[in-house]
Amino acid sequence: MSRVLVMGGSSGIGLETVKALLGRGHDVIAFSRGAKNLRLDHPKLDRISGDATNTEEVRNAITDADAVVQALGVPVSLKLLTGPIDLFSSATKTLIPIMEEMDIKRLIAVTGFGAGNSNEAINCVQRIPFNVIFGHAYRDKSAQETLIKGSTLNWTIVRPGVLTNQSLKRSYKVRLKPSEWRNGIISRAAVADYIAAAIDDDTTIGEEPVLTT
């Protein structure tokens, strides 16, 4: 089993991924600003509080890891609409050189449907509201994807659709081909289930699936 660092591991997809990885027997490091307040106890769980854009804090957290899950998020706020947002690209600029230096190859990064080349699959009805609400964040997520693809890491980019807090149903769809890409709902638990299964699955390296129900 791997020892996995989950960045953004105290909430949202990150927290669900921590739970899913623990359920599969992995050792997990939950890394986030609020990690010390994480209300989850498990003998294979370590918590490290830190800033994903701080080089020394990331280096300290990643030291014993075999793989990294990047599941960062920004809160819904006025800044999401007005921007600018650079968390995703800044954290990735911090992370990649450290992983390459320490020869930690496996990275799974969560972005979203509409980031990178999946933006072309947004239909005309959704495009205007998507750009108004999520434009700043997703431009930065697209920059994040570009950085990851330009690295030497064994990466998988995960692009969930509209997120819900519903319980896990393993009937979700993993849309690998651009011709299959479309928006749809997906639970955070389902995204985490995919990540936990993919972490040691070399067949997912270089893939960028869109996940929906």
Regions flagged by a language model, labelled:
Residues 29, 90, 94-136, 150:
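Conserved Rossmann-fold NAD(P)-dependent oxidoreductase catalytic core, especially the SDR/UDP-sugar
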Residues 145-167:
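Conserved beta-loop-beta element that borders a ligand/cofactor-binding pocket
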Residues 36-90, 94, 98-101, 199-203:
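NAD(P)H-binding glycine-rich loop region in Rossmannoid oxidoreductase-like domains
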Residues 4-24:
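N-terminal Rossmann NAD(P)H-binding glycine-rich loop of SDR-like oxidoreductase domains
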Residues 158, 186-196, 207:
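Substrate-positioning beta->alpha
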Residues 77, 113-119, 163-166:
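Conserved catalytic-site region of short-chain dehydrogenase/reductase
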Residues 167-172, 198-207:
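Glycine/proline-rich active-site loop of Rossmann-fold NAD(P)-dependent oxidoreductases
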Residues 26-33:
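Conserved glycine-rich Rossmann-like NAD(P)H-binding loop of the short-chain dehydrogenase/reductase
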